[in-house]
Every structure is written in structure tokens, then in C-alpha cells.
Design a protein with these regions (language model features):
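Solvent-exposed alpha-helices and their adjacent loops that cap or buttress functional pockets
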Residues: 6, 64, 93-95, 112-116, ...
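Glycine-rich phosphate-binding loop of actin/hexokinase-like ATP-binding domains
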Residues: 117-174
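Active-site nucleophile and cofactor-binding loops and adjacent substrate-binding regions
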Residues: 100-108, 123-124, 149-152, 288-298
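ATP-binding/phosphotransfer module of carbohydrate and carboxylate kinases, centering on a glycine-rich
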Residues: 1-60, 66-68, 113-118, 163-331
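Short glycine-aspartate micro-motif
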Residues: 1-5, 68-72, 101, 119-123, ...
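Glycine/charged-rich beta-loop-alpha catalytic/anionic-binding loops adjacent to active sites
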Residues: 69-71, 91-94, 98, 137-146, ...
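Short beta-strand-loop/turn "lid" adjacent to the catalytic site in phosphate-handling enzymes
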Residues: 50-101, 111-114, 257
Length: 331
């Protein structure tokens, strides 16, 4: 079985046997079909599939048939059903397996975080998203297309808010904040406005702005009001997603796992986590939150093993334990 977890910032591929042994893995950059086109994005996956196969001692260059029985691909930017179908068709066309299932990458986080057949997952990493699942297959989802669909936060969004508050503090349009000096110091420039200019001119890569998330946390820990407000706003958004998903699935008053993951949440910053847990307990007192740092590719692999088990081709509890243990050793 071929497990793929392709996020905005990195992609992991694993070749896993039906009993949970990990034969080969590969890691690459982010999966962004909106920048590269679908074919270009799948080409990037193909290179990683070949790398994982090579580690397993397999050569897939000769066209000798499918590499695996099944592909379980959990992909960022597969946000709409039409996108999932398009990507599933594109991956299936590569001939890596007999069957292919594509899902949004947040489902990998959910599966990595719980073996229960129901629950909710919120990812807050480069972006922010949420999914929920019931045993009968019903789901709760959000478009997660950014501000245009009501999203706020994630590392990318928070970083822009930090820049917004910092530059406005410097030019007089906003309240003073320690963020301004902290942003300037982080990049070794004279001011936050100078950082903005450097990003605009290409002197500082825009991709480095995510480095401002720890800067925000530090200023919040030191009591800067603007920084504290941003952290609290992020907590509100995380809980809003989780509570709405729970409500849609009829789980708001039930004992259900709420899996929290992605780089921003995995950092377990105390102010953020305290705010998330307090707010979640107020709206869903029986919810069982858990922060997951297990690589999401484990979730993709577990979903693949679930598929094999449903087809009587392997999988099962022992295989799930084996794949979790294998990745724990690799960490």
C-alpha cells in the first residue's frame, strides 16, 4: 500500500505492507497544484514514489505493473469534491496501484490522532482547516479556501497579522506594540516597515514570514496586548471550527475526540493551548482534545490499512500497531 501525505509545506510518501511493515519512505516539498498545475504536482509525487520504491528495493521504471494494491493519498489543496475527484483521477492514471482514494490532508491528521470511527480534527499549520467524521461515513467539512471562505489564521495568516499590526504601530495608524521591534530584530532590519519593503523587493523571501509565529508567541508570553489578542483570536477560530463540526455531526454533547495538529498547535504554546482548551470545554464539555505530533503520513497509512481490511486484503489492529511503531522508531 502506498501512503501519501502531501501538505502545503512538505510531502511524505511511504510504501507499507498489508501487515504494517514500512518498506520505504521519501520526503519532499509542499504540494501546491494551484501553482504548478495538477500534472506538475503529481510529477512531484512521482519522484517521491520512485524514491520510496528504491529504498524498498523496487524499480518502477520498467512498467512492470502496479507498485501497490492501493494508494491512500491525503492532499493539501484537495479542498472541494471536484478537486478530490480531479486529483484522484490524475493519481490513478499513473498506474501505481489497483485502487486509489484521495482525501483532504486533514483526514490524515484525524486518523493519526484517533482509532475511533468518529471525531473531529483541526489543523493549524501553514493554514487552517477542520474535518469531522461519523461511523456511517458522513463528514463535516469547510471549503478552507482562505479569507474568501471565512478562514482566519494558521501560520501564514498569523504572520501577516503580525506584520499588519507592526507596520501600523510604526506609522501611527495602530496601537504601539512590542511586535514591531521584535519583527525588526528577527530579520536584522531597522523596522517592521523595512521588513515589509524587503519582502516586497524580494530581498527577504515571503516564505520566511512564517518565522514570525514564534515571535508572536514570545511577545504574547511577555504580555504585549496586541500579541495576546492575536493568540486569543487564533484560539477562537480553532474552537469555532471544532464546535461547528461537532454540532453538524450531532457530537457537541457527546464524548468525541477532537484532534489538534499542525505546527502552530503542535508547538503547545501555553497561552494558545490554555485558550483553546478553556473555550472548547465551555462549548463541548465532553469533547476529548488531544494534540497530535505523529507524522500525518501515519494517518494516510492507517486509512490505507483500513481500506485493505475492508477488502479482506490485510490491515487490522496488529498492522495498525506495527505502522505506528515503525514511524515512532524512524522519528
Amino acid at each position: 500500500m502506498l501512503a501519501i501525505d502531501a501538505g502545503n509545506s512538505k510531502t511524505d510518501v511511504a510504501l507499507v505492507t498489508a501487515d504494517g511493515a514500512v518498506l520505504g519512505t521519501a520526503r519532499g516539498g509542499g504540494f501546491r497544484p494551484y501553482l504548478t498545475g495538477t500534472d506538475g504536482a503529481i510529477d512531484g509525487l512521482a519522484a517521491l514514489v520512485a524514491e520510496a520504491a528504491a529504498e524498498a528495493g523496487l524499480d518502477i521504471s520498467g512498467g512492470q505493473g502496479p507498485l501497490a494494491t492501493h494508494v491512500s493519498a491525503c492532499l493539501a489543496n484537495a479542498d472541494l469534491p471536484v478537486e478530490e475527484r480531479e486529483l484522484q483521477q490524475a493519481i490513478a492514471a499513473r498506474g501505481w496501484s489497483r485502487t486509489t482514494v484521495v482525501a483532504n490532508d486533514t483526514f490524515a491528521l484525524l486518523r493519526a490522532g484517533t482509532d475511533a470511527p468518529r471525531g473531529v480534527a483541526v489543523v493549524c499549520g501553514a493554514g487552517i482547516n477542520c474535518v469531522g467524521l461519523l461511523p456511517d461515513g458522513r463528514t463535516a467539512r469547510f471549503p478552507a479556501l482562505g479569507q474568501i471562505t471565512g478562514d482566519w489564521g494558521g501560520g501564514g495568516g498569523i504572520s501577516l497579522e503580525v506584520m499588519w499590526s507592526s507596520t501600523r504601530a510604526e506609522d501611527g495608524r495602530g496601537e504601539p506594540t512590542a511586535l514591531a521591534g521584535a519583527v525588526a530584530a528577527h530579520f536584522g532590519l531597522a523596522s517592521a516597515s523595512a521588513v515589509a519593503e524587503a519582502v516586497h523587493l524580494g530581498e527577504v523571501p515571503e516564505g520566511r514570514l512564517h518565522e514570525l509565529v514564534p515571535v508572536l508567541f514570545r511577545c504574547a508570553e511577555e504580555g504585549d496586548p496586541t500579541a495576546v489578542q492575536l493568540v486569543e483570536r487564533q484560539a477562537e477560530e480553532i474552537v469555532a471550527l471544532a464546535s461547528v463540526a461537532l454540532r453538524r455531526l450531532g457530537l457537541l454533547d457527546s464524548a468525541a475526540d477532537v484532534v489538534l495538529g499542525g505546527g502552530v498547535l503542535a508547538a503547545r504554546q501555553p497561552l494558545l493551548m490554555d485558550a483553546v482548551l478553556t473555550r472548547l470545554a465551555a462549548v463541548a464539555p465532553l469533547a476529548q482534545p488531544r494534540v497530535v505530533t505523529t507524522p500525518p503520513v501515519v494517518g494516510a497509512a492507517l486509512l490505507g490499512l483500513d481500506h485493505l481490511a475492508s477488502a479482506s486484503l490485510g490491515g487490522g489492529a496488529a498492522a495498525q500497531d506495527a505502522v505506528r511503531a515503525a514511524f515512532a522508531l524512524r522519528d
